[in-house]
Amino acid sequence: MVDKRESYTKEDLLASGRGELFGAKGPQLPAPNMLMMDRVVKMTETGGNYDKGYVEAELDINPDLWFFGCHFIGDPVMPGCLGLDAMWQLVGFYLGWLGGEGKGRALGVGEVKFTGQVLPTAKKVTYRIHFKRIVNRRLIMGLADGEVLVDGRLIYTASDLKVGLFQDTSSF
């Protein structure tokens, strides 16, 4: 039985990383340090820009986050690829929330644009995922557009984020 709520705490997300939230066959989020959100504040099967599902999640920013110490020394900034990965993580999480089973794998993205950055002085990153399509056949796949905001200001956009759930990844 899927634990299907509208919001999830950090402990819930950590449970997902241990395979405890969506069951033994459900997709898992990564563990820290690669878990790129602290909470999911909204999940719906409708809504979003296409009325086919919406996820909103947040990451609290503080200067002690691991990536600020190495990217870059003297010029700390959150790597843009981590924001992109967070959006893929949320697409996979949504597929598990819908009851999908398998191991989540990012399959691609149409276009990514960066128009800002996350500095250690920021307070909060918000991720917004707008689902366009869910394929539920032999392969379960989510297709969505995403946005990353820092302290309420839009800084990244991604179109056609794709994540699939695989029963067997040995030949992937």
From Swiss-Prot:
Pathway: Lipid metabolism; fatty acid biosynthesis
GO MF term set: (3R)-hydroxyacyl-[acyl-carrier-protein] dehydratase activity; trans-2-decenoyl-acyl-carrier-protein isomerase activity
Keywords: Cytoplasm, Fatty acid biosynthesis, Fatty acid metabolism, Isomerase, Lipid biosynthesis, Lipid metabolism, Lyase
Catalytic activity: a (3R)-hydroxyacyl-[ACP] = a (2E)-enoyl-[ACP] + H2O; (3R)-hydroxydecanoyl-[ACP] = (2E)-decenoyl-[ACP] + H2O; (2E)-decenoyl-[ACP] = (3Z)-decenoyl-[ACP]
Annotated Gene3D superfamilies: Hotdog Thioesterase
A biological process term (GO) from this entry: unsaturated fatty acid biosynthetic process
E.C. code: 4.2.1.59, 5.3.3.14
Gene Ontology, cellular component aspect: cytoplasm
Family as reported in the entry's similarity comment: Belongs to the thioester dehydratase family. FabA subfamily.
Quaternary structure note: Homodimer.
Protein name: 3-hydroxydecanoyl-[acyl-carrier-protein] dehydratase
Species per Swiss-Prot/TrEMBL record: Escherichia fergusonii (strain ATCC 35469 / DSM 13698 / CCUG 18766 / IAM 14443 / JCM 21226 / LMG 7866 / NBRC 102419 / NCTC 12128 / CDC 0568-73)
Gene for this chain: fabA
